[in-house]
């Protein structure tokens, strides 16, 4: 009988849980309220900070609480061009400036936005990584829908009430610089999770992995595996719709 393979061990957590001790906190938009739905609310960028394990910087933005006499600090993903002391306006009637938060229905076609909500009020789900952005393709006022192009190139239709931040997420070009050394990769993943270094299955013994063993390193069978396979067999291309080289012109789904 074989051993418990790596992906089975990951499911149990333990040493594979993410390293969150040095994180600044969850980066989200403001909770959707009356001020944002019908007008705007003003905040100020107090600080731009590094977040461990994240490629993009974070901005700590302070808003007045609309219901109580106090200040509320929100953590936004910083956009390129945002600076400390800058006023951030959030709401339907906010101006079209970098860093401001607006519903997609109030943003003209061709505008670049980031940290876009998938559903109104979820506080940001799309285009959140460094250098990422979403492009507004068009609006359908009759159905209150907006069509956008995601960083992957796929197109998606979402509600025009979903909010986004004007501009591109800061930290673009991060992946263009090669790591070059194993030591740099070590420090990178030390703050993320236990996912490095990753031993190949064909380099293992047959007891450790479905691809292990043999007089030379080869998988020895088709690497596609069914969705209904038991967890100890799930290694390789799991439930792949297709495999191999993409030939000809690629079409993005409309």
UniProtKB/Swiss-Prot annotation:
Taxonomic superkingdom: Eukaryota
GO CC terms: cytosol; cytosolic large ribosomal subunit
Chain positions of cross-link Glycyl lysine isopeptide (Lys-Gly) (interchain with G-Cter in ubiquitin): 46, 93, 119, 145
Coiled-coil annotated spans: none
In-chain residues carrying the UniProt-annotated modification Phosphoserine: 52, 95, 159-160, 249
Single GO MF descriptor: rRNA binding
Keywords: Cytoplasm, Isopeptide bond, Phosphoprotein, Ribonucleoprotein, Ribosomal protein, RNA-binding, rRNA-binding, Ubl conjugation
Function comment: Component of the ribosome, a large ribonucleoprotein complex responsible for the synthesis of proteins in the cell. The small ribosomal subunit (SSU) binds messenger RNAs (mRNAs) and translates the encoded message by selecting cognate aminoacyl-transfer RNA (tRNA) molecules. The large subunit (LSU) contains the ribosomal catalytic site termed the peptidyl transferase center (PTC), which catalyzes the formation of peptide bonds, thereby polymerizing the amino acids delivered by tRNAs into a polypeptide chain.
Family designation: Belongs to the universal ribosomal protein uL2 family.
Further comment: There are 2 genes for uL2 in yeast.
Subunit field text: Component of the large ribosomal subunit (LSU). Mature yeast ribosomes consist of a small (40S) and a large (60S) subunit. The 40S small subunit contains 1 molecule of ribosomal RNA (18S rRNA) and 33 different proteins (encoded by 57 genes). The large 60S subunit contains 3 rRNA molecules (25S, 5.8S and 5S rRNA) and 46 different proteins (encoded by 81 genes).
Annotated protein name in UniProt: Large ribosomal subunit protein uL2A
Organism: Saccharomyces cerevisiae (strain ATCC 204508 / S288c) (Baker's yeast)
């Amino acid at each position: 009988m074989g051993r418990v393979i790596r992906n089975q061990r990951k499911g149990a957590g333990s040493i594979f849980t993410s390293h969150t001790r040095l994180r600044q906190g969850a980066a989200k938009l403001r909770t959707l309220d009356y001020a944002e739905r019908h007008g705007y609310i003003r905040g100020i960028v107090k600080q731009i900070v590094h977040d461990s394990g994240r490629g993009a910087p974070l901005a700590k933005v302070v808003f007045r609480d609309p219901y109580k006499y106090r200040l509320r600090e929100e953590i936004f993903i910083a956009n390129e061009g945002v600076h400390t002391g800058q006023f951030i306006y959030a709401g339907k009637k906010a101006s079209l400036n970098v860093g401001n938060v607006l519903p997609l229905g109030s943003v003209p076609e061709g505008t670049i936005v980031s940290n876009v909500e998938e559903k109104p009020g979820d506080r940001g789900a799309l285009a959140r990584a460094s250098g990422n952005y979403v492009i507004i393709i068009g609006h359908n006022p009759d159905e209150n829908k907006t069509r956008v192009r995601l960083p992957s190139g796929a197109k998606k239709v979402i509600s025009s009430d979903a909010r986004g931040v004007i501009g591109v997420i800061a930290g673009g070009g991060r992946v263009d610089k090669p790591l070059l050394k194993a030591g740099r990769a070590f420090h990178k993943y030390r703050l993320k999770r236990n996912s490095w270094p990753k031993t190949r299955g064909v380099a293992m013994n047959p007891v450790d992995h479905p691809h292990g063993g043999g007089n030379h390193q080869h998988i020895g069978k088709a690497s596609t595996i069914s969705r209904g396979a038991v967890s100890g067999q799930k290694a390789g291309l799991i439930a792949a719709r297709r495999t191999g080289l993409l030939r000809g012109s690629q079409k993005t789904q409309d």
